[in-house]
């Protein structure tokens, strides 16, 4: 009995680690592919026209999403999710040399500028552009 319990606990711990460590993944829903970022963890996000990045916030009203995000109901199979999704204009008008204007997302959160290639790297924003 003790041995079984020990194996059960080990399995649950490993399962938990794998669950928490999973990367953002893409899910096709309707017209868009959604890139899901689990547990509201800050990581790089991108939007290449048909991908929108969402936090699994389970918001129940539009006001729970941040200013630069859009509240969406998303149906996948039999389940409904309520998500906060980044809007299409997050990257702004990147000019290729790291000085995209970033529009609402980068400006409001970091007071900095996008890197112009469609990705957000918080480290660069904090160290290089936030001046």
From Swiss-Prot:
Sequence repeats lie at residues 91-92, 93-94, 95-96, 97-98, 99-100, 101-102. Residues 91-100 are annotated as: 6 X 2 AA tandem repeats of N-G. Residues 1-23 form the signal peptide. It is found in: Secreted, Extracellular space, Extracellular matrix. Its main location: secreted. GO terms for cellular component: extracellular region. Component of conchiolin, the organic matrix of nacre. Expressed at extremely high levels in the dorsal region of the mantle, which region may be responsible for the nacreous layer formation, but only in trace amounts at the mantle edge, which region may be responsible for the prismatic layer formation. This is N16.3 matrix protein.
